[in-house]
Amino acid sequence: GMNPNAKIPEGMTYEDNTFLDMLKEDLNINVVYDWVASSSDYDEKMNLCIGSNTIPELMNVNAEQYRALLKYDLIQPIGSYYEDYASDKLKSYVESGGEALQKVICNEDGEMMAIPAPNITAGGVNEMWIRQDWLDNLGLEAPRTWDEMVAVAEAFVKEDPDGNGENDTIGILGPANSDYVNGNGGNRYGLDPLFSAFQSYPKYWMKDDSGNVVYGSITEETKVALEKVAGLYADGLIDPEILVRNDSSEPLLAGKVGIFFGPWWCGYTVGDATLAQEADWQAYFTPLAEDGKFYTHMAEPTTKYVVASKECKNPEAAFKIINYLIEYEQGWVDSGATSGLSTSDLYPLYNVYDNANEIEVSYDCLKKYLAGEIGIDDVDYSTHKLLKSDMEAITKLKKEPYDDFSLEYWNFEDEDLAKTNLPRLVSIMVGDAPLVNEEYVPIYNSYDGRTKTMDSKWSNLTKLEEETFAKIITGKAGIEAFDSFVEEWKASGGDEITKEIQDEVDMQQ
């Protein structure tokens, strides 16, 4: 899959470039492309190859393609090659994904079928981000339950938390017209936690206790959640321009918003407000469900799979190529050896490799480092690419007390240093704090492939769902519209798709 806008230096091509020379010279691996396609045509071309069983020996595929390759029995197990050839670093990345990752890269016999590039676990968890300074102005505690959140949102709308005498504040921000109420994994400005509080997981395929697959958007729990969210909108507590405005960042950065939802990296989203010292944003697992637990849907453990066809005689080459990338990529960047070359465009089987728990590890190390429990030389940085620079920056940017990450305890004197590092440090130390310090119940998608009927009917079903949810939330339709939506969804291909997914999931048991 080639980026059509890739900048390829003069005299080089995809088939003839520095990276391929290195692999030939250092590993005696001769990389030959079966075909080259731009990113936009790549999936189509790969799907054709899968359909006609003319796949390359080694390839980088997405989740849907991987499921299809497994289903049609076109790829070989690579577990023994993994044991013998994967470097310690590659193994540590794969192991960091734990059981959730193992489940998706193994076939029903438990054999490893793919080399994954793990997704960062924290990226799939949406939390409540809230203006701590507004809470302080109004003498309120950070809300944790649904009812507390409602009371705080009401105060944010009605009690002039910014003290400007104007009635111009938004309690809970929502998605703009190009965003989503519910997403898969991380969903900035979405309302996912408002649904999970009722154990509703729209857009996810759930397995019930007896192993039956159910689509999360059509459950009774989702009906309950929609009615509750519609109530917030009717009471003026959710952005009145939800799903209409062009950009939800606008009111946010204008200082008009008290609460929004999103993943750990939203420290970057509020970065400008932090750097201007205008807003103290903190993150919480809110709202808790009635049983006091925080339920959250998770991102897929990986969306990038490197696989070997049944015909491939040397699957170990894939491990050697990936080991080499992991070992030397940072060095190439630091030394300028590959300047002008885009590794992601030209390196074969390229993926970004990270630890699934990278952000939690970073939080833990930075916290211990600030507390004087570890020194800068006590950490193995070999698989933690950014941690050393984080540690160096945090000592200069953090004021005492070292365990309080409120706005006033950051140091803003060195503007350049703050600009470069603070949004990231806030993302880790504020955004990831709930994930490290509190329990949560992770809910995974049971199916991330694509069935036959999905090809023809899924986009219409998705449109029906999103339009219905939007109408119910904004009061253009009553909650009874949910029941007719479910009927229509089932009759228009939903039941058919559910059965196809059930068959696939049963096969994998």
Task: Indicate where each model-derived feature is located.
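Polar, glycine-rich mid-to-C-terminal structural blocks
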Residues: 227-230, 279-288, 294-375
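General small-molecule cofactor/ligand-binding pocket signal
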Residues: 30-36, 240-241, 282-284
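Extracytoplasmic/periplasmic substrate-binding proteins
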Residues: 2-18, 122-129, 136-142, 177-235, ...
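Helix-loop-helix "hinge/cap" segment bordering the ligand-binding cleft or interdomain interface
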Residues: 79, 107-186, 207-256, 306-341, ...
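Carboxylate/His-rich catalytic cores and anion/metal-binding grooves
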Residues: 63-100, 104, 153-156, 165-205, ...
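Conserved small-residue motifs centered on glycine
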Residues: 330-467, 476
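Conserved N-terminal structural module of periplasmic/extracytoplasmic solute-binding proteins
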Residues: 1-149, 193, 213-215, 333-335, ...
